[in-house]
């Protein structure tokens, strides 16, 4: 609200007076400046207004003379008029009592604050009137003293009266005096200070209302009057001489807020007060009131419109602290008029306008539909349509949930709307709770969201409870069908032990506490404990109405605590007390009976509750107590207790079957390893079960020899049988012997004898009786060359009955490969029974060469060989297809070249070449024939080479093999075949379609492989420079090199030494034309 002040309280009764400042402040300032010459000029307002201090202390001590307030009421009309004026405009400050900060004497300030008391409003009003009258009485006493002499006077007067001080009343009077600090508003700083000193002297004399000290006090007061008159006259002269300067000086004071007290800035900080210095006596005021009222009335009547303010010494009121309790009590109980505000305050004339504006704003807020304070529409207004809907829905809601009128009142307090927001027909377009099929409207200021998070959570909880209730009913129906009704046995557990029994079970508890089965009608306390158990699980019990507790405690439904305990344990899959105490033989039957009894009892309770309160969403009965299994026993989902220690409670047959299956699996997995040998010691429990291990440990372990050596069998770790020999585990799989030392020495001697003369009969006997096995020492110390002796190898060959060549029978395998025998390991090829299957050894003396590192038995080797054979055939077929395509390409190129050669018949008749004149396609010229022989020369007339050249090539029957084998395609060709191919004419070659045919005229059959070789050797060459002698010589050298390569039993490769492209490049480097060369590499690609 504009123009309003902060809501702080004051002690002024605003029913009759206004606490605002006057609006005509400038006029008061001018009047104050004009009237300073004719009278004592109090300080007036200047351009900057003083900050008004609003600390109020309106309580009066119960230890002071309250009866004096009636006597101090003045009938002077001037006093009443001035009092009303001061209250209405606050021109002289508030008639409140200030407690200032103590600076020099902290002990007295804390002592005075301990005895402060707060009274009711009537005492505060009486004290306000007293303070106003005291102010008038003090005005006459404020004319006597200066600031310089005030300290010594007060010290001398009060210190002499210490023996007459009543400290209880002194503290109360000090509080009254502290609150009266701002009442002296009519004089300047000197007059105010001197009047306060004089009043202090009067008060210090009257320390107690006893009549014994009255005579002494009267004598002191007469002296004070004389001093006050002298001070008044001197002060008037000083004020008349410097009126304006005094006003500016008085207005220059500053408030200092320190800790709990507020002090002024122009005080004498080095001043120390004595005890009882500022005790106020209202009786003395009445006695001396006549003379003081005259001077006071002269000042006040002439300067009624001026604003007066205090300039209080800081040291004068420095020992008083604010009573915080009284201060905040006054603030909370009074109105906020006349308090400290900003510099721009409103006067009396502005109040009606501000009140009218406030009413208009409030009415707009009440009538505005679009504004809401807590998210609801019409917070204070009423909508007839809404009221009707609320009534209808409220009645319907009460009928469904069974609420009474008290619950309705609670619901009205808790929420503004009793029906969900999405069911309101006014907001049917807003699908806040829709399933997403309808488009949702965005929220706006005209349609605020009416449901907060609390309401949403309530709705979700209600829906969840409904679903859980339905599921529970279905479970009960299924359980009734599966289980047979039988009697139940429950333990009689005390109510105090309920919480203990939920978490702890004792073995002896169930044996002595068996009780009868049945339903107890006096089960009120049991259900109460069930509610306690539900409070442990459910966190929303405080939101439930009070009706449910009456429903639960009605005694209509009852059960026992042990039953509820077992229900909890049943859901959590934990063993109950009943099962822990029973034996294993009778455990299953008793558990089944108890389960059926528990579930039947819970079924009866649940059906009754469901029939009576079917639609009750907030029902907290046993049927609505749902337990999170993971909260009670997190490990129950993974672990089920075995029958030996404690058995798990299973509520259905399917759970039992699952648990039995899991137990069987667990026994299978944790089956103990049993060795055949009964004398075995130090069994390692960490070993895998025997099913995962092979029969002979280490039978598949292989040692890889260097691949540089071909034909050596890979070594193998030795194996042992543990039937008759004791052994112990070293590192899981390796063993050590446990024979005696004497037996070991005997075995060592036998070992040395075997090294010199190996005994083969030992191996033959070991197969029969499995005795006399190798020990660890024997394996470590045996000779590596034992297998290399001729007799031993001969015996091994006779045992295997394999066909082996003469070199291997003589035992010269190492000599053949010329590789020294290096011992690799003490376990290599030792401890192997030679009479076992072939898969335990790789046949080193068989015809088949096994590559280094080849692992597997004969069966796997055969499979791998078949796979390799199929792969080789596939690659061979692909290679043949590529060659056939290249041959066709070559023939096409040759036919093209023949057509070009027909135009050059005259130039090509050199060196015995006869030109065939016919134009048919068979008159081709073989440009690759030998220059020394005619192309028509028969093969038997070809020059024969040295026999030693042909003897290097073995004449096998593999030369004319089918094209499916790779050997024939890569086999070297002898000189005779080359001369035969080179001496033949083109007409002698068979066509591709007649490979297996026979030419009767020539008497030769050309195979497919020979045709491939022929095509590669007789590759076409460009004939641009055929007549040149150098070209012919290079062609001859090329052909002669091919013949030499074939004579030396070297293979032709597509990127080898004798490729056409390499030789052509060499010829180009030597000076010949590069175009003359034929790219032989491209042909074989």
From Swiss-Prot:
<feature type="compositionally biased region" description="Basic residues">
    <location>
        <begin position="474"/>
        <end position="483"/>
    </location>
</feature>
<dbReference type="GO" id="GO:0032545">
    <property type="term" value="C:CURI complex"/>
</dbReference>
<feature type="compositionally biased region" description="Low complexity">
    <location>
        <begin position="54"/>
        <end position="66"/>
    </location>
</feature>
<feature type="compositionally biased region" description="Polar residues">
    <location>
        <begin position="39"/>
        <end position="48"/>
    </location>
</feature>
<keyword id="KW-0805">Transcription regulation</keyword>
<dbReference type="GO" id="GO:0005634">
    <property type="term" value="C:nucleus"/>
</dbReference>
<feature type="compositionally biased region" description="Basic and acidic residues">
    <location>
        <begin position="283"/>
        <end position="297"/>
    </location>
</feature>
<dbReference type="GO" id="GO:0003713">
    <property type="term" value="F:transcription coactivator activity"/>
</dbReference>
<comment type="function">
    <text>Transcriptional coactivator that together with FHL1 regulates the expression of rRNA and ribosomal protein genes. Its activity is negatively regulated by environmental stress.</text>
</comment>
<dbReference type="GO" id="GO:0006357">
    <property type="term" value="P:regulation of transcription by RNA polymerase II"/>
</dbReference>
<feature type="compositionally biased region" description="Polar residues">
    <location>
        <begin position="241"/>
        <end position="251"/>
    </location>
</feature>
<feature type="compositionally biased region" description="Basic and acidic residues">
    <location>
        <begin position="209"/>
        <end position="239"/>
    </location>
</feature>
<dbReference type="GO" id="GO:0003712">
    <property type="term" value="F:transcription coregulator activity"/>
</dbReference>
<feature type="compositionally biased region" description="Basic residues">
    <location>
        <begin position="513"/>
        <end position="524"/>
    </location>
</feature>
<feature type="compositionally biased region" description="Polar residues">
    <location>
        <begin position="9"/>
        <end position="18"/>
    </location>
</feature>
<dbReference type="GO" id="GO:0000785">
    <property type="term" value="C:chromatin"/>
</dbReference>
<feature type="region of interest" description="Disordered">
    <location>
        <begin position="747"/>
        <end position="774"/>
    </location>
</feature>
<feature type="compositionally biased region" description="Basic residues">
    <location>
        <begin position="76"/>
        <end position="85"/>
    </location>
</feature>
<feature type="modified residue" description="Phosphoserine">
    <location>
        <position position="1041"/>
    </location>
</feature>
<feature type="compositionally biased region" description="Acidic residues">
    <location>
        <begin position="607"/>
        <end position="620"/>
    </location>
</feature>
<feature type="region of interest" description="Disordered">
    <location>
        <begin position="283"/>
        <end position="302"/>
    </location>
</feature>
<feature type="compositionally biased region" description="Basic and acidic residues">
    <location>
        <begin position="584"/>
        <end position="599"/>
    </location>
</feature>
<dbReference type="GO" id="GO:0031509">
    <property type="term" value="P:subtelomeric heterochromatin formation"/>
</dbReference>
<protein>
    <recommendedName>
        <fullName>Protein IFH1</fullName>
    </recommendedName>
</protein>
<dbReference type="GO" id="GO:0005730">
    <property type="term" value="C:nucleolus"/>
</dbReference>
<dbReference type="GO" id="GO:0060963">
    <property type="term" value="P:positive regulation of ribosomal protein gene transcription by RNA polymerase II"/>
</dbReference>
<feature type="region of interest" description="Disordered">
    <location>
        <begin position="1"/>
        <end position="251"/>
    </location>
</feature>
<dbReference type="Pfam" id="PF10380">
    <property type="entry name" value="CRF1"/>
</dbReference>
<feature type="compositionally biased region" description="Acidic residues">
    <location>
        <begin position="676"/>
        <end position="686"/>
    </location>
</feature>
<keyword id="KW-0597">Phosphoprotein</keyword>
<feature type="compositionally biased region" description="Polar residues">
    <location>
        <begin position="484"/>
        <end position="493"/>
    </location>
</feature>
<feature type="compositionally biased region" description="Polar residues">
    <location>
        <begin position="546"/>
        <end position="557"/>
    </location>
</feature>
<feature type="region of interest" description="Disordered">
    <location>
        <begin position="457"/>
        <end position="493"/>
    </location>
</feature>
<dbReference type="GO" id="GO:0000781">
    <property type="term" value="C:chromosome, telomeric region"/>
</dbReference>
<dbReference type="InterPro" id="IPR018837">
    <property type="entry name" value="TF_CRF1/IFH1"/>
</dbReference>
<feature type="modified residue" description="Phosphoserine">
    <location>
        <position position="208"/>
    </location>
</feature>
<feature type="compositionally biased region" description="Basic and acidic residues">
    <location>
        <begin position="747"/>
        <end position="764"/>
    </location>
</feature>
<dbReference type="GO" id="GO:0060962">
    <property type="term" value="P:regulation of ribosomal protein gene transcription by RNA polymerase II"/>
</dbReference>
<dbReference type="GO" id="GO:0042790">
    <property type="term" value="P:nucleolar large rRNA transcription by RNA polymerase I"/>
</dbReference>
<keyword id="KW-0804">Transcription</keyword>
<keyword id="KW-0539">Nucleus</keyword>
<comment type="similarity">
    <text>Belongs to the IFH1 family.</text>
</comment>
């Amino acid at each position: 609200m504009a123009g309003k002040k902060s809501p702080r309280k004051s002690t002024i009764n605003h029913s009759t007076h206004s606490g605002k400042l006057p609006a005509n402040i400038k006029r008061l300032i001018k009047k104050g400046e004009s009237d300073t010459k004719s009278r004592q000029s109090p300080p007036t307002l200047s351009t900057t207004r003083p900050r008004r201090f609003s600390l109020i202390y309106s309580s009066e001590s119960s230890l002071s003379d309250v009866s004096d307030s009636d006597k101090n009421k003045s009938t002077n009309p001037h006093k009443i008029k001035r009092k009303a004026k001061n209250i209405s405009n606050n021109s002289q400050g508030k008639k409140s009592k200030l407690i200032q900060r103590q600076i020099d004497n902290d002990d007295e300030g804390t002592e005075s604050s301990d005895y402060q008391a707060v009274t009711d409003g009537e005492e505060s009003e009486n004290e306000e009137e007293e303070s106003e009258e005291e102010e008038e009485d003090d005005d006459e006493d404020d004319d006597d003293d200066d600031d310089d002499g005030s300290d010594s006077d007060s010290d001398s007067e009060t210190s002499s009266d210490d023996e007459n001080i009543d400290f209880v009343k002194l503290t109360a009077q000090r509080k009254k005096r502290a609150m009266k600090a701002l009442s002296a508003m009519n004089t300047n700083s000197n007059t105010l200070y001197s009047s306060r000193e004089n009043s202090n002297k009067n008060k210090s004399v009257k320390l107690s209302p006893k009549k014994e000290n009255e005579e002494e006090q009267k004598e002191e007061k007469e002296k004070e009057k004389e001093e006050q008159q002298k001070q008044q006259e001197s002060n008037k002269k000083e004020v008349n001489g410097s009126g304006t300067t005094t006003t500016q000086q008085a207005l220059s004071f500053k408030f200092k807020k320190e800790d709990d007290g507020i002090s002024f800035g122009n005080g004498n900080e080095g001043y120390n007060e004595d005890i009882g210095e500022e005790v106020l006596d209202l009786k003395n005021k009445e006695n001396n009131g006549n003379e003081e009222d005259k001077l006071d009335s002269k000042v006040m009547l002439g300067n009624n419109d001026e604003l007066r303010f205090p300039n209080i010494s800081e040291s004068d009121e420095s020992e008083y602290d604010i009573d915080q309790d009284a201060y905040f009590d006054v603030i909370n109980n009074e109105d906020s008029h006349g308090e400290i505000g900003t510099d721009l305050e409103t006067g009396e004339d502005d109040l009606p306008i501000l009140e009218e504006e406030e009413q208009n704003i409030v009415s707009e807020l009440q009538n505005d539909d679009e504004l809401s304070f807590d998210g609801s529409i019409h917070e204070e207004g009423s909508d007839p349509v809404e009221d009707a809907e609320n009534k209808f829905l409220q009645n319907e809601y009460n009928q469904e949930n069974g609420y009474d009128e008290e619950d309705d009142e609670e619901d009205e307090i808790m929420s503004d709307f009793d029906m969900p927001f999405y069911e309101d027909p006014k907001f049917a377009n807003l699908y806040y709770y829709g399933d997403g099929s309808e488009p949702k409207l965005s929220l706006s200021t005209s349609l605020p969201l009416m449901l907060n998070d609390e309401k949403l959570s309530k709705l979700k909880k209600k829906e969840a409870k409904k679903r859980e209730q339905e599921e529970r009913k279905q479970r009960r129906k299924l359980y009734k069908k599966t289980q047979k009704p039988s009697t139940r046995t429950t333990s009689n557990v005390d109510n105090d032990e309920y919480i203990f029994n939920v978490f702890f079970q004792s073995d002896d508890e169930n044996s002595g506490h068996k009780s009868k089965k049945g339903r107890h009608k006096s089960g009120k306390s049991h259900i109460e404990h069930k509610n306690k158990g539900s409070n442990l699980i459910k966190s929303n019990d405080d939101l439930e109405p009070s009706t449910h507790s009456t429903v639960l405690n009605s005694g209509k439904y009852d059960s026992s605590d042990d039953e509820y305990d077992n229900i909890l344990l049943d859901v959590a899959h934990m063993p109950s007390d009943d099962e822990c105490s029973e034996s294993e033989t009778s455990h299953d039957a008793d558990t089944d009976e108890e389960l059926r009894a528990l579930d039947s009892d819970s079924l009866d309770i649940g059906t009754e509750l469901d029939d009576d309160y079917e639609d009750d969403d907030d029902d907290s009965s046993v049927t609505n107590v749902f337990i999170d299994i993971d909260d009670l026993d997190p490990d129950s989902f993974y672990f089920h207790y075995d029958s030996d220690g404690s058995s798990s409670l299973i509520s259905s047959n399917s759970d039992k079957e699952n648990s039995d299956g899991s137990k069987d699996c667990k026994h299978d997995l944790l089956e103990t390893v049993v060795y055949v040998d009964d004398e075995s010691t130090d069994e390692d429990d960490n070993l895998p079960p025997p099913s995962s291990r092979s029969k002979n440990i280490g039978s598949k372990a292989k040692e890889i020899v260097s691949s540089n050596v071909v034909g050596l069998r890979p070594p193998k770790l030795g194996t042992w049988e543990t039937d008759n020999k004791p052994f112990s585990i070293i590192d899981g799989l390796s063993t050590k012997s446990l024979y005696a030392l004497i037996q070991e020495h005997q075995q060592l001697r036998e070992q040395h004898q075997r090294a010199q003369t190996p005994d083969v009969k030992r191996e033959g006997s070991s197969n029969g009786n499995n005795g006399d096995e190798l020990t660890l020492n024997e394996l470590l110390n045996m000779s590596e060359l034992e297998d290399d002796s001729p007799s031993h190898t001969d015996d091994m060959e006779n045992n295997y009955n394999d066909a082996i060549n003469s070199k291997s029978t003589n035992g010269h395998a190492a000599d053949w490969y010329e590789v020294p025998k290096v011992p690799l390991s003490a376990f290599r090829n030792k401890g192997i029974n030679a009479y076992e299957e072939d898969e335990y050894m790789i046949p080193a003396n068989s015809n088949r060469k096994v590559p280094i590192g080849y692992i597997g038995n004969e069966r796997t080797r055969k499979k791998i060989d078949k796979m390799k054979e199929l792969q080789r055939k596939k690659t061979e077929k692909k290679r043949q297809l590529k060659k056939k395509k290249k041959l066709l390409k070559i023939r096409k190129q040759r036919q093209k070249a023949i057509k070009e050669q027909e135009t050059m018949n005259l130039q090509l008749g050199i060196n015995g070449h006869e030109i065939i004149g016919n134009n048919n396609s068979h008159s081709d010229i073989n440009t690759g024939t030998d220059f020394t022989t005619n192309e028509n020369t028969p093969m038997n007339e070809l020059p024969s080479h040295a026999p030693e050249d042909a003897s290097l090539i073995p004449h096998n029957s593999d030369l004319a093999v089918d094209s499916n084998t790779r050997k024939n395609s890569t086999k070297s060709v002898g000189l005779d075949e080359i001369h035969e191919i080179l001496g033949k004419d083109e007409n002698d070659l068979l066509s591709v379609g007649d490979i297996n045919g026979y030419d009767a005229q020539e008497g030769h059959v050309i195979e497919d492989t020979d045709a491939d070789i022929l095509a590669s050797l007789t590759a076409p060459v460009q004939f641009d420079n055929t007549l040149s002698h150098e070209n012919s010589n290079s062609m001859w050298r090329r052909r002669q090199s091919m013949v030499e390569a074939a004579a030396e039993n070297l293979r032709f490769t597509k990127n080898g030494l004798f490729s056409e492209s390499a030789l052509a490049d060499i010829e180009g480097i030597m000076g010949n034309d590069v175009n003359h060369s034929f790219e032989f590499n491209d042909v074989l690609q």
